Regions:
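Histidine-centered, transition-metal-coordinating active-site segments
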Residues: 6, 10-112, 116-122, 130, ...
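Short alpha-helix carrying the canonical HExxH Zn2+-binding catalytic motif
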Residues: 134-139, 230-231
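Short active-site segment of divalent metal-dependent hydrolases/proteases
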Residues: 139, 143-144, 235
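A glycine- and small-aliphatic-rich helix-loop capping segment at beta-alpha/alpha-beta transitions
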Residues: 148-161
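Short strand->helix junction
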Residues: 105, 144-145
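Ser/Thr-rich, low-complexity intrinsically disordered segments
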Residues: 1-5
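A generic membrane alpha-helix/interface feature
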Residues: 145, 158-159, 250, 440
Length: 440
């Protein structure tokens, strides 16, 4: 009976589906099952200034596609990022508040997913390529260090002192997808399209300029990349504020510091102005008040969408080439409304001054730097303590393919290793090399 039921279901499916070369019919509706046809179909539904598909030669290595590949190129990039080890490790990397201190603190992974959701929503509203925006968003923080920005600043300082370049997480993210990750025996990296790689690099400024092929000095050439760059800032500021409120850290800090309390009150006033909440004034100290963050995010997302439409109309943007020409002049088209931008900048300045200066965060940052410093100095003084695969890289840093643009490559191997650690692994590795009583 089970076999008969299976056969019946298969016959029903065959009646619904009709395969014909590059097309499949589902109840009479024809859909492409060929990558080229799928990407060509985007031209009918996306705006003329969107990135329809990658340019020729966008991947460094030629990809071998199945004849009936049913994903577009940017969807493939998205999937490669999701299945990478670096992406999985984001789950155990601190955003601002160390995640093992509370079950609901955001991590690099949750932040990344939130940025991807914002980016897809705005891209859909503007008829941009959602797949490209999502791929950029999912890859934008792959190069982040454990324990948040404190370790990034430490590694940057070490390289700068040694005159060996700089360390910025956006550049490291490109380095992860270009060299550190591996999906083929024939080459290093994930072999992503240049459109995705450029967006990852430019979600923050490329201050070192080591990826010259991606035009580091200009804003992102795609509107999809510009969307990710802006919503990344919106996401982390709003959600870091929310985590601070829900944890009770902000309320406790207000009770101890008058200046801090004044700054938080100013943030509250600005948010009330942004939300135009004349009838009901919200505060930012109690858990019950955190739901206003959703309203704030909605307000900012709508501001971005509406102002970006106005920018596109005002600048008479009709093609992707128009977007690129403005980018070459240093101008972006994805922006907040001017009055909202001014208020948001003030909120950002106050959050950096007050929330990120909370004693608990500063204590966690100090401990993180101590761990990173001990690891760095230990590996510099005795590279043989590196794991075998990292030691192999250390001994073969004359490979120009992997270290192009970097000076004194051995130090960069150590930076790569530390930057790739999760919070948990960094603590375990620190214990392994610093505690004489631990078993090896």
């Amino acid at each position: 009976m089970v076999i008969d039921a299976i056969i019946t279901v298969l016959l029903m499916v065959l009646k619904i589906l009709e395969w014909s070369g590059d097309m499949v019919k589902i109840n009479g509706l024809e859909l492409p099952r060929n990558r080229r046809l799928i990407e060509d179909s985007y031209a009918k539904i996306l705006a003329p200034f969107a990135v329809i598909k990658p340019k020729d030669g966008s991947r460094e290595h030629e990809d071998k596609f199945d004849e009936h590949e049913n994903r577009g190129s940017f969807q493939r990039d998205r999937d490669r990022i999701i299945h990478s080890k670096a992406f999985r490790r984001l789950m155990y990397k601190t955003q601002v508040f160390v995640n093992h201190e509370g079950d609901h603190f955001r991590t690099r992974l949750t932040h990344t997913l939130e940025v991807a959701q914002f980016a897809r929503g705005i891209s859909k509203s503007l008829a941009l390529n959602e797949d490209l925006a999502e791929a950029i968003a999912l890859g934008h923080d792959l190069g982040h260090t454990p324990f948040g920005h404190a370790v990034e600043r430490f590694l940057d300082g070490e390289l700068k002192t040694r005159k060996m370049g700089r360390f910025y997480h956006n550049e490291q993210s490109v380095r992860v997808v270009d060299f550190i990750e591996k999906r083929s025996d024939d080459y290093f990296g994930l072999n992503l399209t240049s459109e995705v790689r450029e967006g990852i690099l430019k979600h923050n400024s490329d201050r070192s300029g080591i990826y010259k092929s991606l035009n580091p000095s200009e804003p992102c050439f795609s509107l999809e990349g510009q969307v990710v760059a802006l919503v990344d800032t919106i996401a982390y500021l709003c959600h870091d504020l929310q985590d601070g409120i829900e944890s009770g850290l902000i309320e406790r800090a207000m009770s101890k510091n008058r200046d801090f309390k004044r700054d938080i009150q100013e943030i509250t006033d600005i948010i009330n102005d942004l939300l135009e909440s004349d009838n009901k004034k919200i505060g930012v100290t109690k858990y019950s008040d955190t739901f206003f963050i959703d309203s704030l995010i909605h307000k900012l997302i709508m501001s971005v969408t509406e102002q970006s439409v106005e920018n596109l109309v005002e600048k008479k943007i009709e093609t992707l080439e128009d977007v690129k020409l403005l980018a070459l002049e240093g101008e972006t088209l994805i922006t907040l409304k001017k009055e909202d931008e001014d208020r948001f900048k003030k909120i950002k300045d106050l959050i950096y001054k007050s929330v990120y200066g909370i004693h608990t965060i500063q204590t966690m940052d100090s401990k993180a730097v101590t761990v990173a410093k001990d690891l760095f100095e230990t590996f510099v003084n005795n590279p043989k303590l590196l794991p075998p695969e990292e030691l192999y890289k250390y001994m073969h840093t004359d490979n120009p393919e992997n270290y192009s643009g970097f000076a004194n490559n051995e130090i960069h191997v150590i930076c790569d290793y530390i930057a790739g650690m999760t919070d948990r692994f960094a603590l375990e590795e620190h214990e392994r090399i610093r505690n004489p009583h631990i078993k090896i």
